[in-house]
Amino acid sequence: GVELYQRDVYRPSWLTYANEGFKTIHNLGGKQVVLSPTWTFTREMPPILLPAAGKDPLAFDTFAMLQQAKANQLEGILFPRVRANKSLSKWWTEAKRDDSWWQSWFDRYTEFLQHQAALAQQTGAAAIILGDPEVAPAFPAGTLSDGSPSGVPADAVARWVNLIDQVRSFYKGEILWAVNASDSPPPQEILSRVDRIYLLWSVPLSASMELDPAAMAVEAGHQLDGKALPLVQSTGKGVVLGLEYPSAQGAASGCVLAKDVCVRFENLYPFHADQPDAVLSLDEQTQAYNAMLAAVNQREWITGILSRGFFVPALLVDK
């Protein structure tokens, strides 16, 4: 299946393109599509989280896209995400983050997830994914983008457990938790409350720009055994991989160069500043995915694969 890229790029006109995009996904052999309905933080003090007109999909928009996905024999999954009117790293840094602020934040975020969980239930979505990386400062032992503590309350684990239980009271289907493969997993108390783990995967597969397909497949297996298997063994939960390797030189080694600096993969997506120095390489992207698929095929404990970053309005290659 695929995960659509929606955050910061959604427009109501997507409904015009969605059906053709879903046809393409189905024709490629996809069975699932992940939608990421968003709400926007419009203020830091107090934190206000609401759907922004024209930038966040309304419930009707998400419902219509799920129906179009179903019409193309695709299971719909919701991965609720947040955005802000500025970079989220700046938003978190500038927020007050005292006790009353955190209480307000969790209240607003709970309302957001309750809304999305109810929508998932009403539309018959196959699953809902929690654990949006953009709210990582609110996770237990959360940090800001500079690595400093976010000041999240000491009872953060209990707050997230309660939040998961709230979602489950609205939605009776499968709940997954997103974990970045490069980060430490959340506490067991959180993972024990969900059904499976959605492992966000952009792990380097080569130590150099010179690519060796066989060596990449071996490295992919080594990384899966080191990062994914321990999650399965410690939680007893299945793992779904969310693969993200852009079509740019350096993607397989984890460093797409632009002006001699490694660019974050998300900065290669539409509506971000152009990266003219990044070199297009569809071949490298293909080799990275082939290496991962070869490794996954030898590991039955991986229960699914999704390709992240599909852009519905047009067939694009990364900048």
Where are these regions (language model features)?
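Aromatic-lined carbohydrate-recognition surfaces of secreted/lumenal glycan-active proteins
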Residues: 75-83, 127-137, 152-186, 236-250, ...
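Aromatic-rich peripheral "rim/lid" segments of glycoside hydrolase catalytic domains that contact
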Residues: 277-291, 295, 299-319
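Conserved, mostly hydrophobic/aromatic
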Residues: 25, 33, 128, 197, ...
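Alpha-helical scaffolding within the catalytic cores
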Residues: 16-21, 112-116, 180-188, 223-228, ...
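Substrate-binding cleft and catalytic face of glycoside hydrolase catalytic domains
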Residues: 28-47, 61-108, 112-145
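Boundary/entry segment of secreted carbohydrate-active catalytic domains
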Residues: 1-26
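A solvent-exposed, charged loop/short amphipathic helix patch at secondary-structure junctions
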Residues: 43-50, 96-101, 144-150, 211-215, ...
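Aromatic- and acid-rich polysaccharide-binding/catalytic face
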Residues: 115-134, 140, 179, 183-219, ...
